[in-house]
Amino acid sequence: MAALGQERADGVTHRRNRSRTYRACERIDALHAAPVSGRSGSVGTVTTAIEVEDLSKSYGDLRAVDGVSFSVEPGEVFAILGPNGAGKSTTVEILEGHRRRDSGRVSVLGVDPTEGGRAFRNRIGIVLQEAGVDKELTVRETLDLYSTAYTRRRSIEEVIEMVELADKLDERISRLSGGQQRRVDLALGVIGTPDVLFLDEPTTGFDPAARRRSWELVRDLAGNGTTIVLTTHYLEEAEELADHLIVMAGGIIVAAGTPESLRDQAGEATIIRFALPSVDASLAGLLDPLHGDASGRDRRLEISTTKPTADLAHITGWALQHGIELDGLSVESVTLEDVYLRLVGTDS
């Protein structure tokens, strides 16, 4: 009897979850069925995939986005970086048509996202941090259910091969690992053959090998003309994938360009990092002759220098003179992460 009661309880939970999923799809269908507004009544062909001019959005007294402007070309991977509260999510939600702006001009695929209707929504894909799918459905059932929201769609077989889950097609979502569930989210984002794909932390939960395979998928999509807007906290991911990027902080853009140009803005500096066993009065003898700027926390020191050979010789000579071992000594070129942390702070 207890087992029967549990089975009935599981059945009720399953039906509730399935009901929530169907209601979610009904909302999607309702959005897609909304009339297309604008003079042409359809999404036109444009040379720029996304244009944003002087975009602003406030929540009460909080200015979440303050006069942001940028553009994205077709087939480009465009990354939006920044700490929590920088305005990234609000900006992306406005681009997706899920939030109204207070002022400024926004064009995605030639239309205002809030007025694009079904023609617009059939041309974008969205991979949220959490898709909220019914985990009691199988992968096949989930893809089949969500594909009905799109008028032009890839086959389930094609999509499942793209995300490398062919052997899990008839597995329940609940039985997949976190990384595999994230790949299902990615499959849902591309099943509608989007012209613009929004990726919000797409590789969270992936192991390093799976993350790199997903990068190849993103490159393939972009290479075939899909415009991709990427938000990620993995700076290596942005450096690897982005053609152009912006860094936001406090609702404004604090840096913009290619990953290479942002590194160049930091100069040709080399980063020397190491840890001291202790900090004492003799430290001045280490830092004073250096050509670069020093920063640190606790025992960790970081030297940003344009003369790495001379400074490294001085640092190691000082350490030998004092009989000190420099733990974790490394010499590295400036990375996008270094530039990012200088822009937004190490506590972000």
Residue ranges of each PLM-predicted region?
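A generic structural signal for secondary-structure junctions
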Residues: 125, 147, 151, 246, ...
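ABC transporter nucleotide-binding domain
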Residues: 216-306
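ABC-family P-loop ATPase nucleotide-binding domain
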Residues: 15, 21-56, 346-348
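Intrinsically disordered, low-complexity cationic segments
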Residues: 13-15, 31, 232, 290, ...
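C-terminal coupling/interaction segments
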Residues: 25, 38-40, 308-348
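Short linear motifs in low-complexity or flexible loops
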Residues: 2-3, 9, 13, 19-21
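ABC transporter nucleotide-binding domains
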Residues: 48-50, 57-249, 255
